[in-house]
UniProtKB/Swiss-Prot annotation:
GO cellular component: cytosol
Gene3D superfamilies: Nucleic acid-binding proteins
Annotated gene: infA
Originating species: Halorhodospira halophila (strain DSM 244 / SL1) (Ectothiorhodospira halophila (strain DSM 244 / SL1))
Ranges for domain S1-like: 1-72
Name of the protein this chain belongs to: Translation initiation factor IF-1
Oligomeric and partner information: Component of the 30S ribosomal translation pre-initiation complex which assembles on the 30S ribosome in the order IF-2 and IF-3, IF-1 and N-formylmethionyl-tRNA(fMet); mRNA recruitment can occur at any time during PIC assembly.
Compartment list: Cytoplasm
Amino acid sequence: MAKEDSIRMQGVIVDTLPNTMFRVELENGHVVTAHISGKMRKHYIRILTGDKVTVELTPYDLNKGRIVYRER
């Protein structure tokens, strides 16, 4: 997946799932399942319920995404 093909949206973590997966409610109201990107995993960035995050979605599957940034 090329970076220019991805869709970035803001959201809030609603639920924590096993295997570092999270349920994220996007700003438009949709709920998606997202995992942490590799750089966030490498730097041990912790994500908790209620955190504001930026999620990358692919145009092919809008139900799954990748968390690329956590707001401070």
